[in-house]
């Protein structure tokens, strides 16, 4: 069975019922346990919620409870991820450190990264399996 890593935007779109996530949202609910997010996405969500840059219609505690109920795992950034991160090329058009951590996590954990960010596609040659939504 395929294993997926949702980036921060994909997860947020799922929670706000964005049409880009309609089919995938059904899959998340059907294939419980095959979807995860990185700890970096969790950190980014905390920041976005605290500073009012994103509205999910729930507080952070409710968000975590929902992740647990959907069996969406949280993957920590370990040495395997750090090794991948250190081998990624320095791309001048993509310097966001959180994105690069998420990409490294997907590669290290052999998960398909789901994102709406077209820039992620440039890492396919580095071992990323990418599903653009």
List each language-model region with its residue ranges:
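Alpha-helix capping/helix-boundary segments
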Residues: 10-11, 41, 81, 102, ...
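Donor nucleotide-sugar recognition loop
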Residues: 91-98
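Short active-site oxyanion
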Residues: 31-35, 70-73, 108-112
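Short, well-structured N-terminal submotif of metal-dependent ribonuclease cores
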Residues: 1-38, 53-65, 133
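Acidic catalytic patch
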Residues: 64-91
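Acidic, PIN/NYN-like endoribonuclease modules and their adjacent C-terminal/linker elements
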Residues: 103, 107-133
């Amino acid at each position: 069975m395929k294993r997926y890593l949702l980036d921060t935007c994909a997860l947020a779109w799922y929670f706000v019922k964005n049409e880009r996530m309609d089919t995938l949202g059904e899959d998340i609910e059907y294939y419980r346990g095959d979807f995860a997010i990185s700890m970096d996405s969790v950190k980014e969500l905390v920041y976005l919620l605290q500073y009012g840059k994103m509205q999910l219609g729930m507080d952070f505690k409710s968000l975590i409870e929902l992740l647990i109920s959907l069996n969406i795992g949280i993957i920590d950034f370990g040495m395997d991820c750090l090794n991948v991160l250190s081998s990624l090329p320095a791309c001048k058009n993509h310097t966001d450190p959180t994105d690069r951590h998420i990409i490294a996590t997907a590669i290290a954990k052999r998960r398909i990264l789901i994102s709406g960010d077209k820039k992620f596609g440039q890492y396919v040659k580095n071992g990323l399996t990418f599903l653009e939504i």
